[in-house]
Amino acid sequence: MAAIRLISIGLWSMFGIRLPTQVATGRKSALMSVIGCRTDETDLGGVMEEAEGYENLRVFSELKQFLLGDIRTLQDQLRPSKTNDGDLLSALALAVQMIDGATQGKGGKPLKYDRRIIIVTDGRGSIDTDDLEQIAAKIRDPEAPVDLVLLGVDFDDPDNGFKEEDKSSQKAKNEVSLKGFVEDCNGVFGTLAEAIDQLQIPRLKETRPVPSFKGQLTLGDPGHYDATLTIDVERYPCTMLAKPPTASSFATRTDFGAGSAAGPSDESSHTMTGEEQPMTDLSAVRNQRVYQVDNEEEPGMKKNVEMDELERGYEYGRTAVHISESDMNVVKLETTPMLSLIGFVKAEAFERYLPLSRSNFLVPQRGNQAAQLSLSSFIHALYEADCYAVARLVTKELKPPVIVLLVPRIEVEWEALVDVELPFEEDMRRYKFPPLDRKLTISGKVITEHKDLPTDELTDAMSKYVDAMDLSTFGRDEDGNPAEYAKPEDTFSPIVHRIGHIIRWRATHPDPSLPMPPPSDILTKYANPPADLLDASTSQFEALKKAARVSKVPPKVKGRGKRNRAERDKPISGLDIDALLGNPNRVKIDPSNLVPSFKNALAASDDLETIKEAAQSMSTEIRSLIRSSVGDSGYGRALEALRVMRDELTELEEPEIWNEFIRGLKSDLLEGKLNGNRKDMWWKIRGNRYGLVDRKRSFVSDVTEEEASAFYNVA
């Protein structure tokens, strides 16, 4: 595609929206250029020699693939001019000449390009209309036609009821001439305001149809029997999930000093495509995967394993079962591309929740009239019998087979089979849920009236509220008649288009102090129910609240976790269970029952000193377990005690007690103060992530996430 923008007197309001969108496609064949009309200087960019009538025209950019750097350069160059001289049609002739030169082959024949010229003008100034017919004939050239789009600033728009007041006679004359010229070129004539409004509507990505399967639809085995049905078909995607752009990891680029040689860039060639110099201070990073195993010679340490030393295996229970490469060939299911019918099912008997995948179209092979006739007959037979076909599909050699459902689809201009993937028996999840309208007792008695079951009054109120919130007739068509509200073709994915919008905005506005633009109205239009519909259904909603006995729940009081026992929910009886049972305020930590006794000690009192005393006793017992452990026999109990101690102190919002303890324990382990070399215990603590409690885990902690992460490092 080759496109040129003619921008007059700085009227480039749509530039910041349309160009970044085109750049985001990354297509090398999408060539663009920008030509300024009525500029202060004249620069034809070498397209033609400067001649009379071509003054005050400037080629800001030659016809090429636009990248981010080109947009930013163009932003700096485009400024309002101080002159009214310059002929718009001369600029158009320059644009046509530029497109011709860039889209011709070596033999002088036009190449296969979509050619388009977009003109943005206010219609002021003089226009030489002597050569209109010749220019229009060139634009309509059947061998290389050009799509012409003219957008006028403050042009009269009868459709929207706009008419410029106090319009000069020169502009009125130019509007009439330009409109007739554009219509003669079979182009599009509109206003800039209308174009900007249209740009707010997300542009859907046009994808080239790529077949996922080319083969034969068969009924029976054509390799062994003659009485078989064989139709040549092709399979194309019908629906496919549109995913938003994904973020990549980047590192801040190091600034090299003057005169120093820059080393090789870490940025990938994909990131640097077409850019001689990066436009940001970020550099793409490379990922490297390392495989490690326990080092038997150095307990607690790891050693790297090369890729050629790895073997494949499957987990069987807790054991890895090795499968050699020769055996892997036996495990693989040998399949060949095929689409064979295995059965039929009545349409009313098919459960709509069964499809697993996106939908695809099955159409006859291109140019094969016999296949078209055969498939059309098969589609009509299924449609008239009100049946669906079930088939076994293998799209490529050695790929696992899938079961698909073939549904006939007949429209006015086309016919096709729509296929969706069906689950195997192993794919099904048959959960049983209790009924919503009755309860079953253990004895088998059916109860229809219960506090957890809806009453007739509630059911009736809900039914009326649903009817009042009906969206199927809330909208209005062009004639003002009731129509569906929020049609699928009018709804767009907010996440896909919003992320794309922000990427384009930040690319052209790199200043981080600038606020982000709000999302388009069309993306938020259907985020909430229509206000008019909510107002109209107020009475039904109030009746539903009354029937359901809806009451406001008091807000939850934020406290200091378990510490303040006085604020806990008291039992209905009002009795103090701890006082009745005679539980003491201080509980001694029992080494033989370490975890339960520690929890009891914390629950016995709210006093901070008591909590510190319990934590100190727990830390002593943990050190004792590690010190007296033969090998790693006692490490399991110690790790469990560490986990409980960390969780309980975090819940009590006393992370500083834990952080002080774990710092000391790390030092003792690495310095060998717990009866010898206990570094392997530290590696187990590190592997279980029993380190410092940071602010992310407890808002009262004074440890940052960076400090908590660095704590696991060993100097």
Curated annotation (Swiss-Prot):
Stated family: Belongs to the ku80 family.
An example Gene Ontology molecular-function term: telomeric DNA binding
Xref: SUPFAM superfamilies: C-terminal domain of Ku80, SPOC domain-like, vWA-like
SMART domains, sorted: Ku78 (SM00559)
Gene3D superfamilies: 1.10.1600.10, 2.40.290.10, Ku, C-terminal domain (1.25.40.240), von Willebrand factor, type A domain (3.40.50.410)
Keyword Transferase: no
Name of the gene encoding the protein in the UniProt record: KU80
Chain residue ranges for the region called Disordered: 254-282
InterPro entries cross-referenced by the UniProt entry: Ku70/Ku80_beta-barrel_dom, Ku80, Ku_C_sf, Ku_PK_bind, SPOC-like_C_dom_sf, VWF_A, vWFA_dom_sf
Chief site of localization: nucleus
GO biological process, one term: telomere maintenance
Record localization: Nucleus; Chromosome, Telomere
Top class in the EC scheme: hydrolase
Protein name: ATP-dependent DNA helicase II subunit 2
Role played: Single-stranded DNA-dependent ATP-dependent helicase. Involved in non-homologous end joining (NHEJ) DNA double strand break repair. DNA-binding is sequence-independent but has a high affinity to nicks in double-stranded DNA and to the ends of duplex DNA. Binds to naturally occurring chromosomal ends, and therefore provides chromosomal end protection. Required also for telomere recombination to repair telomeric ends in the absence of telomerase. KU70, of the KU70/KU80 heterodimer, binds to the stem loop of TLC1, the RNA component of telomerase. Involved in telomere maintenance.
Record keywords: ATP-binding, Chromosome, DNA damage, DNA recombination, DNA repair, DNA-binding, Helicase, Hydrolase, Nucleotide-binding, Nucleus, Telomere
Pfam families assigned: Ku, Ku_PK_bind
EC assignment: 3.6.4.12
UniProt xrefs under PANTHER family: KU AUTOANTIGEN DNA HELICASE (PTHR12604), X-RAY REPAIR CROSS-COMPLEMENTING PROTEIN 5 (PTHR12604:SF4)
Catalytic activity from the UniProt record: ATP + H2O = ADP + phosphate + H(+)
Subunit structure of this chain's protein: Heterodimer of Ku70 and Ku80.
GO cellular component: chromosome, telomeric region; Ku70:Ku80 complex
